[in-house]
Amino acid sequence: MKEEKQLDLVIIGAGPAGLTAAIYAIRAKLNTLVLENELVGGQIRETYTVENFPGFNVISGADLADKMEEHAASIGVNIDQFSNIEKIKLSDDEKIIETEDVIYKVKALIIATGAKSRRLPIPEEEKLHGKVIHYCELCDGALYQGKDLVVVGGGNSAVEAAIFLTKYARNITIVHQFDYLQAQKYSQDELFKHKNVKIIWDSEIRNIVGENEIEKIVVENVKTKQKTELKADGVFVYIGYEPKTELFKDSININKWGYIETDENMETNIKGVFAAGDVRSKLIRQLTTAVSDGTVAALMAEKYIGGK
């Protein structure tokens, strides 16, 4: 039989939003637990360098995540890492989170589950994922020393990944569905300094032929419908993110893209249930906005609990 625990607050997710919320909650003397089924730090761990977070001119994403985790631990934040949630029941009157070992009955909940990389929409993605299709340049870039790579996407993540991969790859081809890059101008300028990078505009990958190695990559121009073939050793994909909201879709208002809808206080349609960070429906998703969301969510959770 599973153990039952009563808590003031559970925070699901230990990225920047979740850790910030936890720091504020502990300082407010709330009996708080953070549940995280992956590495503490979230997407920031996969970021090569962070240059727009106040207090650090340049810092690696992993180092910043470590500093956030250390800060949280230093004031007593309790993180149950690699904990999987099996069931969740949310209403105005009760909030129950069930993991493999424990049933938590809580007064308030903050959802900070973040988002995951959107998969390359081709038939071969599943069988080639982790072999020649990758989503993390920091994790897998070193495998391609002196080889040819394709990077898919044109936003900040794609451009910054391409810049990072130039230290390993012989040549890099960016395949982008538009005729312009959406990345920040600073990153674009850095990219264009590298002579071994070229861009195929208005195009998408349709197929990758091969079993354990790439034989050819079929690329289609989205305007002319003309197909061409590329040769490469690996493909790194950065075509946006999908929110991790599967657990909550039956109880919380979620928009058509899967993001949780909240008011300006981070509260969802259920009283006492808040959302923060990239999982929330909003215009801008940045490290600094995630931290801001976590702050507001924790303060409003404290106010909600105090009013019960």
UniProtKB/Swiss-Prot annotation:
Determine the domain of life of the protein's source: Bacteria
Q: Which cysteines are joined by disulfide bonds?
A: 136-139
GO terms for CC?
cytoplasm
**Among the record's GO biological process terms, what is one?**
removal of superoxide radicals
Residues reported to bind FAD: 268-278
Q: Recall the GO molecular function terms of this protein's record.
A: thioredoxin-disulfide reductase (NADPH) activity
The EC number(s) attached to this protein equal 1.8.1.-
> What keywords sit in the KW lines?
Disulfide bond, FAD, Flavoprotein, NAD, NADP, Oxidoreductase, Redox-active center
Q: Does the keyword Thylakoid apply?
A: no
- Quote the PROSITE patterns the UniProt record gives: PYRIDINE_REDOX_2
Q: Which InterPro entries match?
A: FAD/NAD-bd_sf (IPR036188), FAD/NAD-binding_dom (IPR023753), Ferredoxin-NADP_redctase_2 (IPR050097), Pyr_nucl-diS_OxRdtase_2_AS (IPR008255), Thioredox_Rdtase (IPR005982)
- One Pfam family this sequence matches: Pyr_redox_2
Fetch the Gene3D superfamilies from UniProt.
Answer: FAD/NAD(P)-binding domain
Keyword Acetylation part of the UniProt annotation: no
NCBIfam families, per this entry? TRX_reduct
Family designation? Belongs to the class-II pyridine nucleotide-disulfide oxidoreductase family.
- The protein's name is 34.2 kDa protein in rubredoxin operon
- What taxonomic lineage is listed for the species of origin? Bacteria, Bacillati, Bacillota, Clostridia, Eubacteriales
